[in-house]
Amino acid sequence: MSAEEQEEGGATPAEVIEVVGETGMHGEAMQVKCRIQEGENQGRIIARNVLGPVRVGDVIQLRETAREADSIGGQ
């Protein structure tokens, strides 16, 4: 981990490019597609589940960029 990552607690910024939909038992989480802005996965687009209000253009901090959320309603 670099010195910058240690200062930020290991978080990596990612920009929300699409809100896919609501997920969770009561719709409390949103599934979004986001583009990683820094690090070894820079430029990669991944799906993640996010708690709280989020919209396109927001920058979220991800602790881990290797894991991706399952698609909503996947059978």
Swiss-Prot record:
One function term, GO molecular function aspect: structural constituent of ribosome
A single cellular component GO annotation: cytosolic small ribosomal subunit
GO terms under biological process: maturation of SSU-rRNA; ribosomal small subunit assembly; translation
Keywords: Ribonucleoprotein, Ribosomal protein
Disulfide bridges in this chain: none
Signal peptide: none
Origin: domain of life: Archaea
InterPro entries the record matches: NA-bd_OB-fold, Ribosomal_eS28
NCBIfam families in alphabetical order: PRK04007.1
Family: Belongs to the eukaryotic ribosomal protein eS28 family.
Protein name: Small ribosomal subunit protein eS28
Organism: Natronomonas pharaonis (strain ATCC 35678 / DSM 2160 / CIP 103997 / JCM 8858 / NBRC 14720 / NCIMB 2260 / Gabara)
Gene name tied to this protein: rps28e
